[in-house]
Amino acid sequence: MTTPIEKTDAEWKALLAEKGAEPAAFEVTRHAATERPFTGKYEAHWDDGTYHCICCGAKLFESSTKFDAGCGWPSFSQEAVPGAIRNIVDRSHGMVRTENVCANCGAHLGHVFPDGPTETGLRYCMNSASLDFKKK
């Protein structure tokens, strides 16, 4: 997968450490790990602002599109900027899902499901470890 921003694992680790990212951020964003449900700092976070990629700072979601899906991960109904998120078919764990990655740096963000409660019908189910929040 080629993206505009390419770095080695060592460079990503250093960048995330410099940003003060939580310990799980490297494994989540660079190796598609998933944080445990109801443990992420943004799961029950309702401040007004924007959510960005922890790795490169790309704007991903507006807080106005966040909703409580009851799944244990921050959930959004649509991306903030069309094309900011790239979809990849994920066949891991014996199922087929749609993985979301940052279109700018390839960071694993989470998955999108067609069961959202809003007019988009989508539920972007994200890992808090892949996000950085900027308050309005």
Swiss-Prot record:
Name of a matching Pfam family: SelR
GO biological process: protein repair; response to oxidative stress
Binding site for Zn(2+): C53, C56, C102, C105
Gene Ontology cellular component terms for the protein in this record: cytoplasm
Reactions it catalyzes: L-methionyl-[protein] + [thioredoxin]-disulfide + H2O = L-methionyl-(R)-S-oxide-[protein] + [thioredoxin]-dithiol
EC number: 1.8.4.12
Signal peptide: none
The organism's place on the tree of life at top rank: Bacteria
Keywords: Metal-binding, Oxidoreductase, Zinc
Membrane-spanning segments: none
UniProt GO MF annotations: peptide-methionine (R)-S-oxide reductase activity; zinc ion binding
Coiled-coil segments: none
Name of the molecule in the record: Peptide methionine sulfoxide reductase MsrB
Organism: Variovorax paradoxus (strain S110)
